[in-house]
């Protein structure tokens, strides 16, 4: 006999069924509460008292006894008897009766439950609507028991069916709990209509409305509201289905009424939405009057014959006709009397308040307009910065952004009437013959002034033209030469280190270049001086910004020290050629540093002595030691080995031999071929005190390229630099190193992730050791799985025994390709043709 296949019982005999039998649970529903507990914060592990309503056969009680703390009180109740379970109190009772409530109080005594579970369902089979309503009633009874026995911030988990009463139950839950969420765990079958609601944070109200837990009040059918007929009239294209059925007693789908009833009704919209046709009685006296209207056209007659096919425009036409018909029949009287509006004059306080409000509104609009303008300027500035459009024209942009507060606002000066006063400064430069005759000291030769002015202007024009031509040349060269473009981006190879300037000398030079002309008019002088002061501040600000860009961090750190405040810039700035600094500047600076330290030490000792003598007289003053000096005194107590070690480390960090000339000099110093005095002597040359101030850029760059010292180099130095560069080039590029590092990081992260997963698998007590081993081995196979590599194609030369062979050659496995001399010549010809075309491009 053949085997009979057992029915699957609507999919209940799935993996959860067999897993429940393996774990020893009484039903597959135990995995539902396990998954809900894991999803919502492991509330069972924190529960000391648990009540399971409708608990048969007891699978949820088994899970609770396993997850809850030791010595927890777990009570299970159902209408059918259950087999006893360890650590669980079970009894038989109906949860809708008073007997169940009294037994629960007897077992719990003065305790309150932390969690109430409900997984009950009624006997089904009467019909879907009846079964869903009975389930909702049962859920409400379970909620009633939970409200009586739950502790504050307790948890309630229940099962409900998807039905029309679902939203009503959710509303009741939300009145009693802080957080209400509906979920469907994976263990619940998809074909089942059940869903689970998790209610957390029980509010425990002191006074509870009994209607909130009364099934008659909660599930009461509310009467439907009045049907919205306006949507039918003003949006007839959108059809709304009657999902709740048709009205009781309305057995017909076709309705008609008289057109005069439509005119007399107070709710024409509803009538238009309900009726299919308006009938006309030709013998009616009122219709004979309305028939003579010019609005009663043939189109109107055809529209009222079938109202269900009309559109929005047709319905509006019918409503306008009804309005005119009501006026003619006297049903609706048109109010032609115009209401007279009495204008009451404002009082003085009201007028002031109105004007104040107008000014405030005007000020608000001005502020809003100014804010919008500033935002637009910021957006344009950001766009220019993103497009690298940062050029010297930014000065003009900044000046334009000042708006009304700009430096030269001639419109404001013209409105205020002081434009002529502002021009008096230039008017005073023109002297009359009488003034020249009165004062013999004042004599101006106009011809000489014009001649000098023309020659200076020509020189300035020529210089600016040369600078513009040179900038155009650099732009063209950077477009076609990538190396030159990279050099410009780096800022040049031989960029000198800027050491700062003295503010006093700069102010002296600016004062020497200024010419002030006295003016008898005080207001004119004051206006001109303000303008000159603003321009001077702008120029000094721009120069300061340029200096900040050129000043290196090392020089800034040195010159910020207070001891350099009164030092004049009397040291020459030596140029740096090919990465080697002249020895004279190094020696002079080191000597000056030593001398300055000795002078500072003597000065501090003198100040200390003088302070002791004058302490009685000048007690208000206090001499604070410099931080740098304290560091020097602290360093005296260090050992010589630590000093030497720090000096060596600092020396090794600062010096880097990067050129052949520097390597040659290092070899000569190491071999004793040169000493300090030789380096000092070499520092004195014609390039040392070169004056490069106020020279154009094209001249300076040409001098850097051609006018420089050619120092002798050796073969050994060149080989050493070559080996150094070779070692640097042998290192992987930044992208390759970063890619390798990322690969290692991903591998480590993947391994850590697998370790965590393996730990979770080991900690899962619900799985057997065999399942754990299989899952861990599956994870390890994913990590150790090697990427698939394409099989190599074997090349077989079509010569000898393989010549003219139709099938697979002997001894060749996998993919293969037949090649011969003709194919080789063809490939060579193709490469030659491609190379030829590449040269033409």
Swiss-Prot record:
It catalyses: guanosine(2922) in 27S pre-rRNA + S-adenosyl-L-methionine = 2'-O-methylguanosine(2922) in 27S pre-rRNA + S-adenosyl-L-homocysteine + H(+). InterPro entries: RNA_methyltr_RlmE, RNA_MeTrfase_FtsJ_dom, rRNA-MeTfrase_E, rRNA_MeTfrase_SPB1-like_C, rRNA_MeTfrase_Spb1_DUF3381, SAM-dependent_MTases_sf, SPB1-like. Pfam families: DUF3381 (PF11861), FtsJ (PF01728), Spb1_C (PF07780). GO terms for molecular function: rRNA (guanine) methyltransferase activity; rRNA (guanosine-2'-O-)-methyltransferase activity; rRNA (uridine-2'-O-)-methyltransferase activity. Its main location: nucleus. SUPFAM superfamilies: S-adenosyl-L-methionine-dependent methyltransferases. Belongs to the class I-like SAM-binding methyltransferase superfamily. RNA methyltransferase RlmE family. SPB1 subfamily. This is 27S pre-rRNA (guanosine(2922)-2'-O)-methyltransferase. It comes from Saccharomyces cerevisiae (strain ATCC 204508 / S288c) (Baker's yeast). The lineage of its organism: Eukaryota, Fungi, Dikarya, Ascomycota, Saccharomycotina.
């Amino acid at each position: 006999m053949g085997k009979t296949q057992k029915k699957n019982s609507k999919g209940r005999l799935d993996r959860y069924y067999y897993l429940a039998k393996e774990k020893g649970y009484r039903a597959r529903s135990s995995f539902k509460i396990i998954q809900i507990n894991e999803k919502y914060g492991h509330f069972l592990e924190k529960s000391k008292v648990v009540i399971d309503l409708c608990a048969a056969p007891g699978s949820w009680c088994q899970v609770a006894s396993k997850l809850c703390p030791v010595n927890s009180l777990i009570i299970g109740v159902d209408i059918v008897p259950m087999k006893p379970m360890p650590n669980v109190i079970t009894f038989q009772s109906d949860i809708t009766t008073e007997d169940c409530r009294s037994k629960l109080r007897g077992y719990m005594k003065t305790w309150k439950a932390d969690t109430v579970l409900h997984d009950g369902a009624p006997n089904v089979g009467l019909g879907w609507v009846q079964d869903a309503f009975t389930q909702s009633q049962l859920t409400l009874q379970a909620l009633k028991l939970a409200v009586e026995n739950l502790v504050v911030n307790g948890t309630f988990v229940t099962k409900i069916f998807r039905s029309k009463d679902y939203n009503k139950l959710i509303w009741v839950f939300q009145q009693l709990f802080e957080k209400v969420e509906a979920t469907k765990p994976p263990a619940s079958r998809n074909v089942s209509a059940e869903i689970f609601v998790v209610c957390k944070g029980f509010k425990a109200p002191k006074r509870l409305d009994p209607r909130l837990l009364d099934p008659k009040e909660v599930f009461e059918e509310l009467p439907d509201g009045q049907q919205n007929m306006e949507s039918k009239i003003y949006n007839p294209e959108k059809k709304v289905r009657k999902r709740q059925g048709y009205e009781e007693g309305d057995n017909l789908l076709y309705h008609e009424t008289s057109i005069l009833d439509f005119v007399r009704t107070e709710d024409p919209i509803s009538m238009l939405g309900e009726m299919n046709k308006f009938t006309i009685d030709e013998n009616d006296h009122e219709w004979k009057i309305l028939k003579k209207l010019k609005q009663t056209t043939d189109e109107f007659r055809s529209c009222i014959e079938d109202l269900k096919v009309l559109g929005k425009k047709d319905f509006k036409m019918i409503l306008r006709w009804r309005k005119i018909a009501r006026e003619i029949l006297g049903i609706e009287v048109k109010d032609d009397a115009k209401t007279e509006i009495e204008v009451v004059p404002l009082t003085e306080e009201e007028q002031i308040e109105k004007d104040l409000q107008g000014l405030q509104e005007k000020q608000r609009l001005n502020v809003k307009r100014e804010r919008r303008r500033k935002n637009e300027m910021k957006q344009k500035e950001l766009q220019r910065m993103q497009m690298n459009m940062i050029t010297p024209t930014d000065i003009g942009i900044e000046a334009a952004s000042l708006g009304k507060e700009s430096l030269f606002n001639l419109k404001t000066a013209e409105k205020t009437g002081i434009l002529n006063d502002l021009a008096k400064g230039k008017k005073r430069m023109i002297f009359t013959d009488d003034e020249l005759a009165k004062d013999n000291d004042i004599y101006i030769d106009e011809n000489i002034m014009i001649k000098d002015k023309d020659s200076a202007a020509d020189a300035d024009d020529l210089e600016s033209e040369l600078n513009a031509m040179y900038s155009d040349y650099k732009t063209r060269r950077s477009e076609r030469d990538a190396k030159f473009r990279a050099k410009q981006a780096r800022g040049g190879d031989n960029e000198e280190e800027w050491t700062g300037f003295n503010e006093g000398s700069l102010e002296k030079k600016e004062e020497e270049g200024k010419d002030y002309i006295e003016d008898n008019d005080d207001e004119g002088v004051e206006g001109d001086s303000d303008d000159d002061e603003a321009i001077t501040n702008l120029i000094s600000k721009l120069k300061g910004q340029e200096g900040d860009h050129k000043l290196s961090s090392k020089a800034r750190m040195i010159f910020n020290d207070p001891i350099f405040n009164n030092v004049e810039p009397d040291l020459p700035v030596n140029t740096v050629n090919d990465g080697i600094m002249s020895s004279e500047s190094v020696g002079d600076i080191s000597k000056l540093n030593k001398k300055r330290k000795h002078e500072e030490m003597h000065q501090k000792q003198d100040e200390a002595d003088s302070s002791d003598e004058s302490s009685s007289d000048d007690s208000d003053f206090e001499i604070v030691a410099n931080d740098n000096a304290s560091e020097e005194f602290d360093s005296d107590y260090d050992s010589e080995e630590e000093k030497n070690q720090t000096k060596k480390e600092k020396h090794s960090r600062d010096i880097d031999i990067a050129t052949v000339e520097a390597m040659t000099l290092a070899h000569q110093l190491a071999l004793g071929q040169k000493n300090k005095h030789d380096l000092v002597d070499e520092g004195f040359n014609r390039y040392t005190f070169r004056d490069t101030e106020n020279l154009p850029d094209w001249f300076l760059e040409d001098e850097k390229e051609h006018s420089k010292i050619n120092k002798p180099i050796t073969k050994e130095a060149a080989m050493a630099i070559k080996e150094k560069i070779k070692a640097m080039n042998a290192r992987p590029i930044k992208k390759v190193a970063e890619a390798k590092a990322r690969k290692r990081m991903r591998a480590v992260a993947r391994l850590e992730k697998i370790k965590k997963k393996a730990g979770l698998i080991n900690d899962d007590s619900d799985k057997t050791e065999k399942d754990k081993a299989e899952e861990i081995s599956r994870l390890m196979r994913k990590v150790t799985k090697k990427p698939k590599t394409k099989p190599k194609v074997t090349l077989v030369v079509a010569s000898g025994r393989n010549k003219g062979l139709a099938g697979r050659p002997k001894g060749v496995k996998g993919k293969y390709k037949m090649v011969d001399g003709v194919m080789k010549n063809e490939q060579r010809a193709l490469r030659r043709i491609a190379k030829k075309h590449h040269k033409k491009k």
